[in-house]
């Protein structure tokens, strides 16, 4: 599977919102395209579907109306193998509960995923730690880091 270049939401709406008379949103019931290499901020009140959107895009849930395409393919048509390949090479998600191993160092936690994908060289990984302002924490066990440091 080649790298994904765009995520296209077409009139997408969580099923839980379907029975509401009106949903005012910059995301739901819109035609949106998120393009590779661009940065986007989705900011909204609690309970408006931010986590749901991430779960749909990551393939964890499909309880929505409308269409979500990766490039030109409807994601509801993806097989388990295709989802695995996407998550290895094109998608990554920072979960709210972090899903890290507190007994491993920050670098070891990052290397776990990177060893599966072979996506970044160690030099590149170390550069990210530097950019995030936590280069001095690479050999610290994650359980000893602040929550903000763990998120980075």
Regions found by a protein language model. Give the residues of each.
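ABC ATPase NBD coupling module
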Residues: 75-92
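Conserved ABC transporter NBD signature motif
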Residues: 66-75
């Amino acid at each position: 599977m080649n790298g994904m270049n765009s995520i296209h939401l077409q009139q997408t709406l969580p099923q839980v919102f379907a029975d509401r008379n009106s949903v005012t949103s910059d995301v739901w019931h819109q035609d949106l395209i998120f393009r590779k290499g661009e940065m986007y901020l989705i900011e909204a009140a609690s309970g408006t579907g931010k986590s749901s959107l991430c779960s749909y895009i990551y393939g964890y849930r499909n309880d929505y109306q409308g269409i979500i395409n990766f490039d030109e393919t409807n994601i509801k048509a993806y097989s388990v193998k295709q989802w695995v390949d996407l998550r290895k090479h094109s998608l990554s998600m920072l979960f709210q509960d972090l899903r890290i191993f507190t007994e491993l160092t920050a670098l070891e936690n990052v290397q776990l995923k990177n060893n599966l994908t072979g996506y970044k060289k160690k030099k590149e990984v170390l550069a990210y730690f530097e950019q995030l302002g936590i280069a001095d924490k690479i050999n610290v066990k994650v359980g000893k880091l602040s929550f903000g440091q763990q998120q980075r």
